[in-house]
Amino acid sequence: MGQTVTTPLSLTLDHWKDVERTAHNQSVEIRKRRWVTLCSAEWPTFNVGWPRDGTFNPDIITQVKIKVFSSGPHGHPDQVPYIVTWEALAADPPPWVKPFVHPKPPPLLLPPSAPSLPPEPPFPTPPQSSLYPALTSPLNTKPRPQVLPDSGGPLIDLLTEDPPPYRDPGPSSSDGNGGSGEVAPTEGAPDSSPMVSRLRGRREPPVADSTTSQAFPLRQGGNGQFQYWPFSSSDLYNWKNNNPSFSEDPAKLTALIESVLLTHQPTWDDCQQLLGTLLTGEEKQRVLLEARKAVRGEDGRPTQLPNDINDAFPLERPDWDYNTQRGRNHLVHYRQLLLAGLQNAGRSPTNLAKVKGITQGPNESPSAFLERLKEAYRRYTPYDPEDPGQETNVAMSFIWQSAPDIGRKLERLEDLKSKTLGDLVREAEKIFNKRETPEEREERIRRETEEKEERRRAEDEQREKERDRRRHREMSKLLATVISGQRQDRQGGERRRPQLDHDQCAYCKEKGHWARDCPKKPRGPRGPRPQASLLTLDD
């Protein structure tokens, strides 16, 4: 109890510093999270036997590498650094990898004696496309030991096996019929030529899911010597027609050229051929200019010394011998500068309006939108969206340029300033996944419309009732006022003329005199009655 199972994947994660060092030696950069995702989720889907826990089996790694380097839509150029690092760990294993590395089978120098090869028939029939006539010898001819495989049999793979040795020149056999001398051209001459090997390889059935070249420009053989194989015209044609131009999508074409530089290890002439095929004349001049700007001096800073620039990145064919370590170092440095020139020349002038124009589509997932947004940052700005210092700017662009419903909910998140870009993407994914379907949206709109109509009818009825009640109250008040006035008029009319005696004063109500003779009534001239002042239009 308490024991844990060690797998190749967990082993690489425990020694991640060594893995990064191996990747740096291959001139590539890798990330731990992407490493785990490819090993446990992506490569097992290639159906080549890759386990989810990883493996150091070179055969399985080669199959995955073929899938990754496939040209066209089936390739995965973004996975090149990771499979190259896996291959480097298996080819040159550190001490902690050696217990997990599968032992290499011994090289087969005598293919006829291998159990996988069929026995040679007594009267072999020549292949249909053979370049040499098939010569048969009599049955009583002494059998001659063969070093190279039969021309009709399977060939040794130039990628996975060491090249077969050439046949030592020696005296001809002492057979009287001279049959061996007749057979020698058939057995030795065709196999000793790389071109014949290529022509014979074309007669073999094609390997499934392999659309990239299997003959790399520089390939080290078993004797330590490098073999040179130039690019084939079909590879150059496929690379040019299955990828956008450098002006349309510089990032994609740069990734393709980077994978070619890492895996094929081209020479100076091959690099010029590759650039001349994939780039226009103006684009090539821009790339070369940016590459020469990237040359650094002894102090590690970009230099302006013409001699240092020409030594590191010459414009004319240099005398670099790839069979020497010094020549290979020059080629590695040249390819690194060329890659830097491609990256710098692919950067467009800063145009933040282009970045702000990237908005999330109606049915686009937040992850896909974030990738398009990062690509716009790489293409139209000098900023790296993967830089931690630019995470805040990318996060704000992600919020403001998301779909309206997602952006509003992201803006209302609590403690928004402390949220990382990954947190925002996860929240956006939750909101995106909870979106209603078109049918649900139509049903919701119909239900809301019905509820709105019902509320409007109820409000109209309520207003009508309130208006009727108010009118009824006003009429009631008016009737009450009229009735009370009539009552007052009747009562007032009766009290208006009180009964007086014949000798009673109407003014002081005393008897003995009348009102005109009342001593209490004031005497004097009557003044004019005050007249009400009226306003005229002039006032």
Curated annotation (Swiss-Prot):
Biased composition annotated in UniProt, kind: Basic and acidic residues: 435-467, 487-520
Positions of short motif PTAP/PSAP motif: 112-115
Location of the motif LYPX(n)L motif: 131-135
Gene field: gag
Name listed for the protein in its UniProt record: Gag polyprotein
Region (Interaction with host UBE2I): 431-436
UniProt short sequence motif PPXY motif, positions renumbered to this chain: 163-166
Molecular function in Gene Ontology: RNA binding; structural constituent of virion; zinc ion binding
Residues recorded with modification Phosphoserine: S193
Entry keyword set: Capsid protein, Coiled coil, Host cell membrane, Host cytoplasm, Host endosome, Host membrane, Host-virus interaction, Lipoprotein, Membrane, Metal-binding, Myristate, Phosphoprotein, RNA-binding, Ubl conjugation, Viral budding, Viral budding via the host ESCRT complexes, Viral matrix protein, Viral nucleoprotein, Viral release from host cell, Virion, Zinc, Zinc-finger
One GO process term, biological-process aspect: viral budding via host ESCRT complex
Gene Ontology annotations for the cellular component aspect, listed alphabetically: host cell plasma membrane; host multivesicular body; membrane; viral nucleocapsid
Biased composition (Pro residues): 111-127
Region of interest: Disordered: 111-222, 435-539
Zinc finger (CCHC-type): 503-520
Site keyed Cleavage: positions: Y132, P133, F216, P217, L479, A480
Residue numbers with lipid attached (N-myristoyl glycine): G2
Coiled coil: 439-479
PANTHER family: GAG_P30 DOMAIN-CONTAINING PROTEIN (PTHR33166)
PTM note: RNA-binding phosphoprotein p12 is phosphorylated on serine residues.
